[in-house]
């Protein structure tokens, strides 16, 4: 049985003053019947981790390099994330795939680096609007899963997040039936490779999750939580999503 996880991705948002939102999450985190994770920009991981240490809150990174160290100006290694206090890292997010040309094989190498640094890798998969319209969503997701998850990764070391690219930050969400179809497919694909152990891998939905639609999304089969973007920036919004997942 997979653990429920509410994960917030701050993306390129936030300065130290915004950590007041973390303090404001304290009550929601204390009452949560799920794991709660925030992934801020790299500059905020260490100060956020200090606050998180006072509550049952995990902190993560948003990407990592495949190398442990070296001449890679501007990059951050998985070991650096861990040293700053991170326990998780988001990998293969559609914005990284699009903006930085990261391919599934690159993501797999990043996952290996993350695991070597004792980080849990949140591996993102999902289709573009054109791929959805062409009815190749499941093929795309299968290909990304096969290419992005290294063979040696164990269920305890990974989380999979389904994020339809066309729903991220747009206010649009797939129908509940569409979410169920993809999440059931992901579970089936993982089971084909990992057997019954695949049931221990949390499957998150990401794409315009808000307090108002969270409960119905969390009622969908094989949805174990959410990867939340904009709504994770405000404690009032993210707290509502945490409460909805706790009640699911």
Swiss-Prot record:
Subunit record text: Homodimer.
Please state the Enzyme Commission number of this protein: 5.3.1.1
State the reactions this protein catalyses.
Answer: D-glyceraldehyde 3-phosphate = dihydroxyacetone phosphate
Q: What is its main location?
A: cytoplasm
Pathway listed for it is: Carbohydrate biosynthesis; gluconeogenesis; Carbohydrate degradation; glycolysis; D-glyceraldehyde 3-phosphate from glycerone phosphate: step 1/1
Q: Where in the cell is it found?
A: Cytoplasm
Show the CDD domains listed in the entry.
TIM (cd00311)
Locate the active site. 93 (electrophile), 163 (proton acceptor)
Return the similarity comment: Belongs to the triosephosphate isomerase family.
Bilayer-crossing regions: none
Pfam families per the record? Answer: TIM
Described purpose of this protein according to its UniProt entry: Involved in the gluconeogenesis. Catalyzes stereospecifically the conversion of dihydroxyacetone phosphate (DHAP) to D-glyceraldehyde-3-phosphate (G3P).
* HAMAP family, A to Z: TIM_B
Q: Which GO terms describe its molecular function?
A: triose-phosphate isomerase activity
Cellular component per GO, a single term:
cytosol
Q: Which InterPro entries match?
A: Aldolase_TIM (IPR013785), TIM_sf (IPR035990), TrioseP_Isoase_bac/euk (IPR022896), Triosephosphate_isomerase (IPR000652), Triosephosphate_isomerase_AS (IPR020861)
Protein name, UniProt field = Triosephosphate isomerase
Q: Which residues bind substrate?
A: 9-11, 169, 208, 229-230
